[in-house]
Amino acid sequence: LTEVHSQDPSLSSTERRKIAARSVEAINHAIRGIPAEKVRFHTCYGINEGPRVHAAPLPEIVDLILQVNAGAYAFEAANPRHEHEYHVWERVKLPAGKILIPGVITHYSNIVEHPELIAERILRYAKIVGRDNVIAGSDCGFSSQATYNPEVHPKVVWAKFQAMAEGARLASKQLWR
C-alpha cells in the first residue's frame, strides 16, 4: 500500500488510494478462507536507509490498512519519519479483536535502541488501544529483499532484539502491575 506513494510521488492522493484499494482487494482475495486471526499484515515502506520523504503518512492509508482481512497489523513506528504517527490511533478506532504490531526497533539505523525507550514506545500504543491489543515488533526486516543483503550487521540485529525483549519486560511490568 505504501509503495504506490513512494514509487510515483507525482500521483494525486486520489490516484494513489485507488491503486492501493485494488491492492487491498487483491490481498483479501489471496487470503480468502484464512481466518483473520491467523493473518498478520505488514505495511512496508522498503528496507533502505533513504530519506523517506515520499513515504506515505499513516493517516493517509490507515483506513486502507484496516480493510485488509487480518487479525494484526504491523507497521513502521520507530524510525524518525513515522514515530510521531502513533497519534493516528487517537482518532482511528482499532476494530474489536484486532492487534497492532508497531515497530519499536528500527532497521534504519545501526544504533541499538535503549530498552527504556522501547518500553515507552510500547506504552504509547497500549495507552491508546489497550494493553491486550499491542505486540512489540520491528519496523521491518533487516536485510534487503530475499537476497540477504544486510544493511544492519547481524550482531547489531540480535542486540536490537535483545533490547526489544527487555523493553517489553519493562513495559509489561507497568501494564500488568
Q: What positions do the PLM features span?
A:
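Domain-level signal for soluble alpha/beta catalytic cores
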Residues: 1-177
